[in-house]
Amino acid sequence: MFYFPQMLRKLLTLFLIISVGMIPLLSSAETTSPGSLVEKTTLDAKNGLQEAAEQYLIRYRSLSGVDGKSPREDTAAVFIPKGETPKGGWPVVVWTHGTVGVQTTCAPSLNPHSGRDGQYLNTWLSLGFAIVAPDYAGLGSAGLHHYLNARGEAWSVLDSVKAALSAFPLRNQLTLVGQSQGAHAAFASAGYQPDYAPNLHIVSTVLTGVPYFDDKTSAAAIFAGDAGGKEGGDPKIPYAMYIYLSAADTTKGLNVDDYFTPKAAADVSAAREMCIDELTKKVMDDGLNAGNSLKPATQGLLESQTPSLRYSTLKIAHPVFIGTGTQDIDVPTIMQRVFARDVAKAGTSVEMHEYKGLDHTGTMNVSLRDSVPFVLRNLHADAKKH
């Protein structure tokens, strides 16, 4: 495991003492309102974390961010650190996970953590942060998960935090932390929070491997680069399938054969049921890439879906950390650099770190050497302001 020195935890404890009573706790919500708790049970031990003293699965009420109105119930895991609860409650890391699939059984709360994710999350727990880990709408809950739907991610994430704050000894002092799709979900949540969940107090946001779609980039462009190739699998093809499935879920009459070649169409059906690792292996084994999988109409379909992938705003009222591997091909490094530039231009306080030679996965845990001090500095500054 990768843990930080005890001194850092003592420093965090000092920040908590300084800030006790300075940040108001949330009042209990009406039992039928978004963010209200429906059920709290013990999380299956095999899906837990080594550094957690207690771990729970919660079910809570939310609203569908996909259609903007339908009531739903979503799920999240909550991890409580070891040690005595600080006065005022534990500070919170809101962990927004990377791509796992679109089928309900792919939810992180229903599966063991990968070694990478376990190492990362145990580090935050060992530093004295509680973790709220939303599954996202459609994962662990009813309906199809709409991949990279910014509002859909954000509303479910924010409601999970409201529910957790009402049920556990947590401080309304939040750090959003996300990797890959989770970085997208974290930044989307930061953007929607002032209007959708104004009582939540977000101190900072930490992003690694963050996707970005503006009016000059699109999902179509991501897959167009390999359009002429016919050999070799492309690990990004599952994402095109997920975006198609989201479109088909909300648009009647879409026919998979209009958008995918016969070679790929069978895997689109599999994409609804398989989690990401199994689907990616199948795509690679079948040698699927843009050139042999996507029909011309797919580009238009992907273009039509990109508005739902875009962030509501780039101007965030708290500092944002961006960690990028220079060898990231899953979310191209150049896309992340453009994101950092545009977010800073919008007036957000940005701290960006590039990790030479590291890819999408390798960047995540190495970035802790910079993101942990970033988070602690901002907690300290926040305590002084209040």
Specify the residue positions occupied by each region the protein language model found.
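Catalytic-loop region of hydrolases
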Residues: 27-85, 344
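Short beta-strand element of the alpha/beta-hydrolase
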Residues: 77, 88-100
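Accessory cap/linker subdomain of secreted extracellular hydrolases
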Residues: 208-313
